[in-house]
Amino acid sequence: MTNIRKTHPLLKIVNSSFVDLPAPSSLSSWWNFGSLLGVCLAVQILTGLFLAMHYTSDTATAFNSVAHICRDVNYGWVLRYLHANGASMFFICLYLHVGRGLYYGSYLFTETWNIGIILLFAVMATAFMGYVLPWGQMSFWGATVITNLLSAIPYIGTDLVQWIWGGFSVDKATLTRFFAFHFLLPFIVTALVMVHLLFLHETGSNNPTGIPSDPDMIPFHPYYTIKDILGFLIMLTALSTLVLFSPDLLGDPDNYMPANPLSTPPHIKPEWYFLFAYAILRSIPNKLGGVLALVLSILILAVVPLLHTSKQRSMMFRPLSQCLFWLLVAVLLTLTWIGGQPVEHPYVIIGQVASVLYFLILLIFMPLISILENYLLKW
């Protein structure tokens, strides 16, 4: 008799995605981050659901409701810090996942890659709106500064900002709608993840060599299920260590002060995972130019497949491209550092040089060095 997992209409979809899925035999730990992102999303949705049961999205009570969750709700502090630091783990896994895609040429699966970029934007929007909800100083001023950027859009900008705010400043209406969207977006993200996987399973996984692996496939279960579970354990250990030992390590102390529209914090900055984009935004002394650079810093990923000039897919056997890739990583780390610094010499010029380098590496140096490598290999 055929196994029920192969015949049942629902189970056979799960079976072909997670059990009998043919996978390349050479996948390294860099392929663990997709499943880790799935776990992060599940943790965020679950903790977020329980937080939403106690949170109130009203300017008068939002800050106090978060304090109430931490002090009075059973294990509320665990929920709150799991959710806050879970977002950090989410972005660590996201950036490593995208980096893996860039290094090993996974972007040549263009549909999967483009859905991934949409997912990245959706997760960033979700995280931004979530940061506003505790209604601390940095929540309020972060929301004010970032939404205000839309006023740089010609003609409709000002109207658009007031429409998003629901008034003439960030206030009760803004907080309520941000809560509504923050609740809704993760479910849209979940749907997009399914589309992402659908497109991935049309082509099958890439592998570290970038060479087609059709002749040498192994079943996903038990090989990669066990490997993924090890990844889960390592990530959840790291997350619980962060939550239980230094839950505020990645947060901003200003957010423990209730939002006050009459007093601006000395340094307005977003959460650490947006600092690289914030540094690029600040490096251009023009509002519209800065906003365009900010959007393009992520959207540039969409042109990477078009600029692939190498005859090889992966960077595994391309040392010159590897050097450029790690230079790009160094530039991004520099931008992250600069985003958290005040706008003064020498940070301004360092940020501007790093921003220019970021775009140059992706748009010009990578394609050129690939052409050189083809020539050196007589291809």
Swiss-Prot record:
UniProt GO BP: mitochondrial electron transport, ubiquinol to cytochrome c
Cofactor note (record): Binds 2 heme b groups non-covalently.
InterPro entries the UniProt entry points to: Cyt_b/b6_C (IPR005798), Cyt_b/b6_C_sf (IPR036150), Cyt_b/b6_N (IPR005797), Cytb/b6-like_sf (IPR027387), Cytochrome_b (IPR030689), Cytochrome_b_C_euk/bac (IPR048260), Cytochrome_b_N_euk/bac (IPR048259), Di-haem_cyt_TM (IPR016174)
Protein name per the record: Cytochrome b
Gene Ontology MF, one: metal ion binding
Gene it is expressed from: MT-CYB
Family per record: Belongs to the cytochrome b family.
Additional record remark: Heme 1 (or BL or b562) is low-potential and absorbs at about 562 nm, and heme 2 (or BH or b566) is high-potential and absorbs at about 566 nm.
Cofactor or coenzyme needed: heme b
Native species: Erophylla sezekorni (Buffy flower bat)
Subunit structure as annotated in this protein's UniProt entry: The cytochrome bc1 complex contains 11 subunits: 3 respiratory subunits (MT-CYB, CYC1 and UQCRFS1), 2 core proteins (UQCRC1 and UQCRC2) and 6 low-molecular weight proteins (UQCRH/QCR6, UQCRB/QCR7, UQCRQ/QCR8, UQCR10/QCR9, UQCR11/QCR10 and a cleavage product of UQCRFS1). This cytochrome bc1 complex then forms a dimer.
Sequence positions that bind heme b b566: H97, H196
Residues involved in heme b b562 binding: H83, H182
PANTHER family (UniProt xref): CYTOCHROME B
Keywords: Electron transport, Heme, Iron, Membrane, Metal-binding, Mitochondrion, Mitochondrion inner membrane, Respiratory chain, Transmembrane, Transmembrane helix, Transport, Ubiquinone
Sites where the protein binds a ubiquinone: H201
Residues passing through the membrane, by range: 33-53, 77-98, 113-133, 178-198, 226-246, 288-308, 320-340, 347-367
Compartments, record wording: Mitochondrion inner membrane
Function: Component of the ubiquinol-cytochrome c reductase complex (complex III or cytochrome b-c1 complex) that is part of the mitochondrial respiratory chain. The b-c1 complex mediates electron transfer from ubiquinol to cytochrome c. Contributes to the generation of a proton gradient across the mitochondrial membrane that is then used for ATP synthesis.
The keyword Heme is assigned to this record: yes
GO cellular component: mitochondrial inner membrane; respiratory chain complex III
